[in-house]
Amino acid sequence: MIIRSITPADQEQLLLLEEELHDNEGKEHRAILEEALGSKETISLLAEQAGDAVAYLLATEDQPLKGNLIVLRLAVRPAFQGQGYGSILIAALKDLAVQKEKEAIWIDCSEDLLSYFSQQGFRDEAESDRGIHMVWER
């Protein structure tokens, strides 16, 4: 497995990954992906197995609070879920946050992912219109 930054050449594979997820927010995630890949402020991480994209993470710097990162999207191809790819990408983002001297990483998640992100060291901070607002602080 290789963890690397996403390049424009990866976009089609990532859009196919989003289609495989079959969630109701596919169009929203496609728009997030396209916008994020066009921004120089985006942190993008790709987990690649045998040349195939199996998971990716997008994050950006919080504009009002420059010392924080916000996870925009974490997606794992269904056939690879439960195998640690999401955890590896989150760990890589934490390492980057420490290197870049960021204070915290924020993510909004649905209630069914609360225990997953708690296991990754995030804590429940508040509820928002986008789900449960969670934070990891270094």
Show where each model-derived region lies:
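Extreme N-terminal starter segment of soluble prokaryotic enzymes
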Residues: 1-3
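Short acidic/glycine-enriched loop/turn segments that link adjacent beta-strands
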Residues: 65-66, 128-132
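Conserved acetyl-CoA pyrophosphate-binding loop and the N-cap/start of the following alpha-helix
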Residues: 80, 84-92
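Conserved GNAT acetyl-CoA-binding A-motif
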Residues: 97-109
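Conserved active-site alpha-helix within GNAT-family acetyltransferase domains
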Residues: 99, 111-130
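Short beta-strand-to-coil "C-cap" segments at the C-terminal boundary of structured domains/repeats
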Residues: 134-138
